[in-house]
């Protein structure tokens, strides 16, 4: 992964990411490097350009730790993991959930508090189930959010390497 401070890169929490194919297409269009980080082997299509695979081992949070450690201004982090989103934002990265939700410093506190509350309610048996299933509108929202994040970074002076 190119780690020049003024370049754009995409870091993907890949184990359960439903939008990897979309990330590859957008990255290719913008000539951006992508790092797929996972706890196990993830296949990357041959035609995907500039994609690096990082397989981490160890604890369940090893992929999150790797992504948080490599987050920086100019990085776009794609994750559904709220604590990881918070850590990446602290490092100055742009963060997008696979459903297209853009996390910011001003929204992550409430999002993290809601996540923690729902975890507590699930543990107490008050709430069952989880988030809604991934839908086509989520894929479309994600593509829009990723393009928007890249455009904003380019306007801020970051560039493709």
Curated annotation (Swiss-Prot):
InterPro entries on file: UPF0178
Residues in coiled coil: none
Lineage: superkingdom: Bacteria
Family note: Belongs to the UPF0178 family.
Name of the protein in question: UPF0178 protein BOV_1904
Classification of source organism: Bacteria, Pseudomonadati, Pseudomonadota, Alphaproteobacteria, Hyphomicrobiales
